[in-house]
UniProtKB/Swiss-Prot annotation:
GO terms for cellular component: cytoplasm. Transfers an acetyl group from acetyl-CoA to L-homoserine, forming acetyl-L-homoserine. It comes from Methanomethylophilus alvi (strain Mx1201). This is Homoserine O-acetyltransferase. PANTHER family: HOMOSERINE O-SUCCINYLTRANSFERASE (PTHR20919:SF0). The active site is at C142 (acyl-thioester intermediate), H235 (proton acceptor), E237. Keywords: Acyltransferase, Amino-acid biosynthesis, Cytoplasm, Methionine biosynthesis, Transferase.
Length: 309
């Protein structure tokens, strides 16, 4: 089944050229089915690239998904024009009056800043609080996961001695969780961050469950007891060359970054990386949509959140 996007969204053309099933709004309007309504709160500076990466994964599901993109009113983007954002992105005031089946909160390159010092932190907290009664399940990515764990559960983040950059092996510790259905015993996905959350803090909270860990990267995936909150500490949505782009970007800034671990063949940046996390990313995004959202959400979307009132 397709993902529905605005008629003239540039990402749609890219996805169609990759043979992804994308449905334009005017075609979807003629269908009489119950699609899933999804928000993507895109905090990444590379807006278009992140749109493509996430929508590519969502479009691989057998479910029709209506996607709305969300921007922060309290932040001025340095990398994406306001004209583009105003054309394709909603603000919180535009979406808060209704219910949503799911929401994705992306990462953001602000790990080295205290949460409270991030210029849009207050607005993000408002959105996360609102989501508890108005969004059925929220998937948090990288810094978005750290932010969500901190806001909802008081879990702190800790600075790393050096950037965690590379593709790391993970293993399931809750093998029967639906989110991991179909995953290999050992599965890989990228991390790109300067801070971490620690297992000992999460284990102490009875409302949270760590379902996947990495010997090198630490906590991999955390879910809440009711599946309403999902936290992925890495970037399984990344393209094959995203870590390469970040590595050369940091080199250009004179930052002397470490070569991403387990990424370039023979640790040689002149060689093209092999993408070994594509199937994992597709499985977990599809499982989230199917098992955490579609199979559990009320058919009447207005019933979302009523059991928490």
């Amino acid at each position: 089944m397709p993902i529905k996007v605005p008629n003239d969204l540039p990402a749609a053309t890219v996805l169609e050229n990759e043979n992804m099933f994308v449905m334009r709004e005017n075609r979807a309007a003629s269908q009489d089915i119950r699609p899933l309504d999804l928000l993507i709160l895109n905090l990444m500076p590379t807006k278009v690239e992140t749109e493509i990466q996430i929508m590519r994964l969502l479009s691989n599901s057998p479910l029709q998904v209506n996607v709305r993109l969300l921007q922060m009113s309290s932040h001025v983007s340095k990398n994406t024009s306001q004209e583009y954002l105003d054309r394709f992105y909603d603000r919180f005031d535009d979406v808060k009056s209704r219910k949503w089946d799911g929401m994705i909160i992306t990462g953001a390159p602000v790990e080295n800043i205290d949460f409270e010092e991030v210029d849009y932190w207050d607005e993000l907290c408002q959105i996360m609080e609102w989501s508890k009664k108005n969004v059925f399940s929220t998937l948090h990515i990288c810094w978005g996961a750290q932010a969500g764990l901190n806001y909802h559960y008081g879990i702190p983040k800790y600075p790393l001695e050096s950037k965690m950059s590379g593709v790391f092996a993970h293993k399931a510790i809750v093998r029967d969780d639906p989110l991991l259905r179909g995953c290999d015993d050992i599965f890989w996905f990228p991390h790109s961050r300067h801070t971490e959350v620690r297992a000992e803090d999460i284990i102490r909270n009875p409302h949270l469950h760590i379902i996947a860990v990495s010997d090198e990267a630490g906590v991999g995936i955390v879910v809440s007891e009711n599946s309403g909150q999902v936290f992925v500490t890495g970037h399984m949505e990344y393209d094959a060359k995203t870590l390469s782009y970040e590595y050369y970007r940091d080199l250009g800034k004179g930052m002397n970054p470490h070569i991403p671990y387990h990424y370039f063949p023979d640790d040689d940046p002149s060689k093209d990386p092999v993408m070994n996390w594509r199937s994992t990313a597709n499985l977990i995004f599809t499982n989230w949509l199917n098992y955490y959202v579609y199979q559990r959400v009320p058919y009447d979307i207005n019933e979302i959140g009523k059991d928490s009132e």
